Amino acid sequence: MAQIDFRKKINWHRRYRSPQGVKTEHEILRIFESDRGRIINSPAIRRLQQKTQVFPLERNAAVRTRLTHSMEVQQVGRYIAKEILSRLKELKLLEAYGLDELTGPFESIVEMSCLMHDIGNPPFGHFGEAAINDWFRQRLHPEDAESQPLTDDRCSVAALRLRDGEEPLNELRRKIRQDLCHFEGNAQGIRLVHTLMRMNLTWAQVGGILKYTRPAWWRGETPETHHYLMKKPGYYLSEEAYIARLRKELNLALYSRFPLTWIMEAADDISYCVADLEDAVEKRIFTVEQLYHHLHEAWGQHEKGSLFSLVVENAWEKSRSNSLSRSTEDQFFMYLRVNTLNKLVPYAAQRFIDNLPAIFAGTFNHALLEDASECSDLLKLYKNVAVKHVFSHPDVEQLELQGYRVISGLLEIYRPLLSLSLSDFTELVEKERVKRFPIESRLFHKLSTRHRLAYVEAGSKLPSDSPEFPLWEYYYRCRLLQDYISGMTDLYAWDEYRRLMAVEQ
């Protein structure tokens, strides 16, 4: 196992216009302060205020959006990071681990990773993801990429259909089809930060949001040693070269994770579990009393000193005593949140320290709060009650189905842009208006300048006389639509769908 030295991981250089020379502790901290400014002032963060956490198109400002959730995750991440550093200081290990002059950057990377962790999520959350992937699967049929004979391939896109005698090109076709049918919010976050927003963050800061290490074009089983880390796609084919450079800069082996990402993940797990239940009470899906009974029933028999007793029962009893001039709901969730944090944060911090050799190497194949402990059971309790009583509620399911329909409908509306031939679409991009394509011209005008420029730049890097060019061009054209639609807020997607479907406002 390699020696633990965080100076080899907290890389303050950038992809473009990187600071040069040896830096003092203060200068390095200023570099990460610059990262904070770039992130907090980015449009991608602002858009989170109109993206779903659990309840789509919610007008009640007390119910969480992706932005307020991310701010809560940021605070919990800061708490865990400080707890880890405090414990390492007590153990006199800060200097041994190369952290004595990097405590500020350590905390900042965790905080900003937490704030950014959802920036790639499409409108309507996981149902938006499912809509994008289902729509592309119905046209690209990635499952046919291994079909024999090749005439069985049902892909409706000529450039991506498998052909006899073109094996090198066929392998690229397989990768592209698989990649486009595995849109994922975490992978889109990497694309946003690097390709679309050009935020030029430090290597360490980007490493903090690379939650999953599986490429989106992966086919087959994942290695047992990395099955958790590769549970979902973490980056796209379009960012393959960037991620390869990232691994080199952060000394990460293939499919390994950046150490501070485990802290971001734990902060998210702790935050959303309690928050989803609180939002459900705010939405009147159930009362606090009903929630307590749901939690009690799901946990089962317990001793007086059990974690359930110390966290949930304690919160319930204190809220009923009404010692403060606050509603029972407010008091219950205040105590529940405090009790939960006071138990889970120190536990997550100690898990990080206990498993630091594997975490530093990037190979720890679990979440920090995923084990056989009562702390893990408490998180599972919150999640299970939310799944059973919140996510399955008719109002929630109806809104999710509407969200799925909106995203599917928008993709269908913009489909004419994908139906154009390479030469026709190239002409449209160059002229922006082509008389014989009135619908396509108007659809093209609606695409954002940022996304159009990303498409043009990607194409300009490819030799147009290469046999691979038509494949890559179509890939980036599909990315153009995925980028545009996934970047919408819930409300904008809803309004855009209604406008283009000529539905009454």
From Swiss-Prot:
EC number(s) stated in the UniProt entry for this protein: 3.1.5.1
Q: Which cofactor does it need?
A: Mg(2+)
Q: Which family does it belong to?
A: Belongs to the dGTPase family. Type 1 subfamily.
Q: Which GO annotations describe the biological process of this protein? A: dGTP catabolic process
List, alphabetically, the Pfam families matched: HD
Q: Which catalytic reaction applies to this protein? A: dGTP + H2O = 2'-deoxyguanosine + triphosphate + H(+)
Q: Does the keyword Magnesium apply?
A: yes
Q: Which domain of life is it from?
A: Bacteria
SMART domains associated with the record? HDc
Protein known as: Deoxyguanosinetriphosphate triphosphohydrolase
**Family matches, as PROSITE patterns:** HD (PS51831)
Domain (HD): residue spans on this chain: 66-273
This chain's source organism reads Shigella flexneri
Q: How does it assemble?
A: Homotetramer.
> Do you know which InterPro entries this protein is assigned to?
dGTP_triP_hydro_central_sf (IPR023293), dGTPase (IPR006261), dGTPase-like (IPR050135), dNTPase_1 (IPR020779), HD/PDEase_dom (IPR003607), HD_domain (IPR006674)
Show the SUPFAM superfamilies listed in the entry: HD-domain/PDEase-like
EC supergroup of this enzyme: hydrolase
**Which GO terms of the molecular function aspect are on file?**
dGTPase activity; magnesium ion binding
Per UniProt, the keywords (alphabetical) are: Hydrolase, Magnesium
Tell me which stretches of the chain form a coiled coil: none
Q: What does this protein do?
A: dGTPase preferentially hydrolyzes dGTP over the other canonical NTPs.
